[in-house]
Amino acid sequence: MTEDLDLAAHWDDAYAQGDATRSWFQDAPRMSLRMLDAVGVTAADSLIDLGGGASPLAGALLARGFRDVTVLDISAAGMQYARRRLGPQAAQVHWLTADVLSWRPRRHYRAWHDRAVFHFLTADEHRQQYLHTLDTATAAGAIAVFGCFAPDGPQRCSGWPVARYSPAQLARQIGTKWLLISQDREEHITPAGTTQPFTWIALRRQT
């Protein structure tokens, strides 16, 4: 519990500096939507956005007609940015303040989206906890989309070391239950004008 609180405090402090100034900021979730489109995720599907925080993805999905959208983030402060941006529409989103490593899903989701959470898990124990949560929250046929730093991406982010992956390396980490079905690369431009290369993959759960 103490570790969860420390992590939450870290990310709350990060968001307190202003979302639009942070390296992860994006005005529109273009690559996320591109990957979801590429693998046939539609408005009829349920979707959970891991580490969604202040991301504009939830709003973009609502605009496309999605009606079963969940955002999970360890930082309540981060999600407040998205809530304020959405205004009354925020009530159409399920907001969960939790650490994905200790969260216990109570349902299945058709689509799992993670932009820049998994690459913070540099310990194998934490990756295994994450993958257990992923498996619990999905069933055969589900889609998982990941965006993580590429091999030539940053070695640290928000003061912490990160893992970097090629598409094949990232798919191997997710495991043999999941089949790699799409991949892409993004050159994310931060508010400071620097470039952060991202690896993107989409997988389908086989069993």
Predicted feature residues:
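Class I (Rossmann-like) S-adenosyl-L-methionine-dependent methyltransferase catalytic domain
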Residues: 1-107, 121-137, 143-207
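A conserved beta-strand element that flanks and buttresses the S-adenosyl-L-methionine
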Residues: 113
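Short catalytic micro-motifs in class I SAM-dependent methyltransferases
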Residues: 116-120
